[in-house]
């Protein structure tokens, strides 16, 4: 009997009982005590007989309900027991298959969450097919296409390389991957439209995964250049998969108009995420593949540039660290080199918004060569952009990080060699005020690198052509260096630069030298006057204290 039936019966009993005179109809009824009280029905008030009968009705109903539930549970338990016995009997007849399935499941389930795949791989039940599928070279020609597809399907099985389990299956998969790469190298028209989805599925199942992250102590000092990269443990499989996918991308059999349905924007976003891998071998393959895709799939070019720009935005404004910035900049250097003239506003915005702000990143040392090359490519395409690049670098100048200052000076010299006189004239004052500060920098590498600017003939020519404005800025810093700098090499370079300036315009040099001496004397007098005033204030304070 259900709870609803019990409630209905209770309501019916209540209605019937209210119409009876319990004192006459049930004269010998004795109630059980309620709430710890004792006595007969009269002890509990006028409603005690009704409550007693209701309790008896509820007790009987509850007992029936309990018996019904027990009976039904017993029947269900018997059914489950018989079913489990039947299942055990059937599994016992195929114990070998279940054991293989457990082993295959273990093979495809990573022990560490960092090695889990971002794309769903094929079920592990196909791992036993590595040994059962015949060799491609042994199959009849008419069956090789289906066999090729079957081998790609079984190669979508992913193994966990964080342990030594399934060594035979791992080696069998590696041999199968090598076999399909060999088949692609020796077979014409092997990438037809029907197989493209299988290719993308197999490649994605293997390479798209959650990248390993290194847990670093935030308080521990470490130099990124000294850190050993964390190599991918699954590289014996990944390398062959990347090699296979590279063959697919560069194959003449692959029509980009058809393949773009499979190598789509979602695929490209996942591919770009892999550039953050710590393994330089993987990033090198990714760089080659992405460059080939950009060259072949023209419909994806604009999207790829925007996606790379988004990666740079995350590096600049969020993480400040990314392992693949250098490789992405290397690809961009080739892309910028192919820009048509005049440059589109889209390409200029990419420079201003995404490339130049990369100078702010703390890890600049890991990719500054590629970034400097991109800057040079833009200036070669449009010399007017030199003003934007140099003034932005001066705005982002790393005042307190001397190692980054040296990198900035290297890039400044390379950019100045490509700068035209009109752009140089616009920024010469702010530029050489910064260089004057660098000349007098106590860090000898910064001072030395700045003085090396006079070894570049084109920069010397630009300086001499604007010497009326620049000599007064530079000569004072050079004289200060010659008297105060501690490094002997910097002293030698300083005297060489002074000699070059004197030979370029002796009259102007003497005039600037005289002005510098007058400024020093005036500064000395101001310093003496300042010291005298402080002395007077000190004496006034002492007199007030004594009083």
What residues fall within each predicted segment?
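Intrinsically disordered, low-complexity basic segments at termini and long loops, enriched
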Residues: 1-56
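Eukaryotic acidic, Ser/Thr-rich intrinsically disordered low-complexity regions
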Residues: 57-58, 64-66, 437-438, 472-547
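Alpha-helical solenoid scaffolds in large eukaryotic transport, assembly, and signaling factors
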Residues: 57-391, 395-399, 404-406, 414-427, ...
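Intrinsically disordered cytosolic tails
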Residues: 101-141, 145, 444, 451, ...
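Intrinsically disordered, low-complexity regions enriched in proline, serine, glycine
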Residues: 193, 215-216, 284, 405-406, ...
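Generic hydrophobic alpha-helical scaffold/packing signal
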Residues: 394, 409, 413-416, 432-439, ...
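Short, contiguous acidic/charged loop-to-helix segments that flank catalytic cores in large enzymes
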Residues: 399-400, 421-424, 437-442, 462-468, ...
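Alpha-helical bundle/repeat cores within regulatory domains of eukaryotic proteins
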Residues: 439, 443-476, 489-497
């Amino acid at each position: 009997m259900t709870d609803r039936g019990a409630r209905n019966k209770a309501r019916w009993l209540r209605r019937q009982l209210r119409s009876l005179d319990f004192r006459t109809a049930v004269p010998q009824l004795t109630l059980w005590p309620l709430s710890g009280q004792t006595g007969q029905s009269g002890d509990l008030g006028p409603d005690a007989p009704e409550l007693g009968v209701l309790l008896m009705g509820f007790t009987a109903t509850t007992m029936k309900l309990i018996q019904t539930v027990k009976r039904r549970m017993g029947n269900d338990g018997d059914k489950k027991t018989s079913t489990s016995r039947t299942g055990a009997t059937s599994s016992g007849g195929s114990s070998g298959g279940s054991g293989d399935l457990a082993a295959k499941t273990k093979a495809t389930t990573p022990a560490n969450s960092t090695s889990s795949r971002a794309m769903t791989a094929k079920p592990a039940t196909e791992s036993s097919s590595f040994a059962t599928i015949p060799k491609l070279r042994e199959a009849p020609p008419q069956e090789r296409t289906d066999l090729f597809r079957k081998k790609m399907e079984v190669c979508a099985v992913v193994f966990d390389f964080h342990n030594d389990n399934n060594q035979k299956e791992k080696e069998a998969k590696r041999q199968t991957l090598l076999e399909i790469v060999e088949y692609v190298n020796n077979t014409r028209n092997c990438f037809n439209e029907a197989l493209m989805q299988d290719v993308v599925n197999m490649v994605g199942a293997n390479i798209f995964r959650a990248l390993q992250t290194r847990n670093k102590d935030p308080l521990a000092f470490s130099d990124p250049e000294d850190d050993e990269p964390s190599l991918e443990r699954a590289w014996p499989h990944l390398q062959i998969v990347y090699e296979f996918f590279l063959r697919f991308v560069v194959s003449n059999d692959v029509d980009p108009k058809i393949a773009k349905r499979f190598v789509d924007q979602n695929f490209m976003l996942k591919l770009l995420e892999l550039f953050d891998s710590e393994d330089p071998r993987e990033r090198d393959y990714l760089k080659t593949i992405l460059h080939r895709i950009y060259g072949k799939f023209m419909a994806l070019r604009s999207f790829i540039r925007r996606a790379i720009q988004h990666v740079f935005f995350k590096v600049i404004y969020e993480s400040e660290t990314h392992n693949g910035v250098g490789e992405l900049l290397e690809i961009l250097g080739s892309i910028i080199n192919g820009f048509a003239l005049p440059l589109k506003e889209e390409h200029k915005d990419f420079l201003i918004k995404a490339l130049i702000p990369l100078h702010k990143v703390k890890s600049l040392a890991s990719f500054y060569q590629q970034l400097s090359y991109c800057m040079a490519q833009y200036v070669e395409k449009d010399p007017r952009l030199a003003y934007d690049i140099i003034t932005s670098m001066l705005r982002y100048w790393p005042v307190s990080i001397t190692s980054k200052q040296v990198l900035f000076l290297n890039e400044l010299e390379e950019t100045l060699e490509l700068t035209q006189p009109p752009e140089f004239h616009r920024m010469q004052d702010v530029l050489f005020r910064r260089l004057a500060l660098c000349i007098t920098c106590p860090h000898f590498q910064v001072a030395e690198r700045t003085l090396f600017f006079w070894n570049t003939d084109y920069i010397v020519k630009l300086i001499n052509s604007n010497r009326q404005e620049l000599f007064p800025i530079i000569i004072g810093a050079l004289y200060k260096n010659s008297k105060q700098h501690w490094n002997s090499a910097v002293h030698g370079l300083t005297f060489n630069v002074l000699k070059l300036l004197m030979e370029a315009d002796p009259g102007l040099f003497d005039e600037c030298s005289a002005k510098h001496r007058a400024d020093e004397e005036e500064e000395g007098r101001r310093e003496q006057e300042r010291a005298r005033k402080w002395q007077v204030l000190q004496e006034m304070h002492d007199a007030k204290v004594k009083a």
